A protein has these predicted regions:
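Phosphate- and other anionic-substrate recognition elements at nucleic-acid/protein interfaces
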Residues: 1-170
Length: 170
């Protein structure tokens, strides 16, 4: 059973394909250059459609886009823009693949995958990076910047992986 996990923002979409907790493929899609939500969604679809595992997916999990804004540091405009993009992306994915897209709270997914959602004093992104790298050798999928540094967009890929590994305990 192949699961596609996604972490979508309006500039970058992290994705991961997993089967039985094994990573098949993962990466991130830079959509900064696309102007409209429609262009961004179709860019994501174009890239995903070129990945061989796309025809085998039977689950799609996407990070719930409004969960991370409890701190109040994000403007309403940004939240609305992200919600609009996520809604369009989910609709197009469901329509294209005829699979229900599940919106998953990132804290719930982390707790399920790692046994805990966070560690006090460690930022969520650092926690995810640390835990994913303890579980897997991700070196073949991680990208570097032109200066040879770890590309921070890899974290979106890691978040996509957490979504892909999430399995609701019935």
């Amino acid at each position: 059973m192949v699961t596609l996990g996604l972490d979508a923002s309006t500039t970058c979409v992290g994705y991961a394909f997993t089967e039985n907790e094994r990573i098949l493929d993962m990466g991130f899609i830079d959509i900064k250059k696309q102007k409209t939500p429609k262009e961004k969604v179709f860019k994501v679809l174009e890239i995903l459609n070129n990945i061989s595992y796309i025809n085998n997916i039977d689950k799609i999990n996407i990070e719930d886009n409004l969960s991370g804004f409890a701190g109040g540091r994000t403007s309403q405009q940004v939240i609305v823009k992200l919600a609009k993009f996520n809604a369009i992306l989910c609709f197009v994915l469901e329509d294209t693949f005829e699979i229900e897209v599940k919106n998953i709270n990132p804290m719930t997914a982390r707790k399920c995958v790692f046994g805990k959602a966070r560690i006090k004093g460690i930022k969520a992104k650092e926690f995810v990076k640390m835990k994913v790298e303890q579980m897997y050798d991700t070196s073949k999928w991680c990208k570097e910047t032109t200066r040879g540094n770890w590309d921070k967009r890899n974290i979106d890929m890691y978040d996509g992986l957490v979504m892909s590994l999430y399995e609701k305990k019935a």
